[in-house]
Design a protein with these regions (language model features):
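C-terminal output helix
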Residues: 107-116
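Receiver (REC) domain active-site loop signature in two-component systems and cognate sites
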Residues: 58
């Protein structure tokens, strides 16, 4: 299963990538890293990820807009929101739009692994 990581923080992109690659999540491979929604849509069209981790607060195209664009492109993409957003209304909006799960920053490696496996239907 291919994973696209979308977050404007290089530190978070690297951490999620490390958790996936070194954390024993078998069957998930990295499809790409994007620092904003526009990059995410471009990379998704080229790599066709099955799973996406999505920050909600990003420049240029935020996570809500990106979720809508990705699901228009491929309604089967499984999205896990990973955000420090304190406004729960936006997180609920993301879930209503089709995101399958939410992990609040800061997160533990184990919390992220379990959420990814759940969203990817691999648990």
């Amino acid at each position: 299963m291919r994973l696209l990581i979308v977050d404007d923080s290089n530190m978070i992109r690297t951490r999620i990538s490390r958790v996936v690659q070194n954390g024993g999540i078998k069957g998930i491979v990295l499809a790409g890293l994007a620092k904003n929604g526009h990059e995410a849509v471009r990379i998704a069209r080229a790599t066709r990820p099955e799973v996406v981790t999505m920050d909600l607060t990003m420049p240029e195209m935020d996570g809500i807009e990106c979720i809508q664009a990705l699901l228009r492109f491929d309604p089967t993409i499984k999205i896990l929101v990973v955000s420090a957003l304190s406004d729960k209304t936006t997180a609920i909006q993301a879930l209503k739009l089709g995101a399958r799960g939410f992990v609040a920053k800061p997160f533990s490696d184990e919390e992220l692994q379990i959420a990814l496996l759940d969203v990817a239907d691999m648990r």
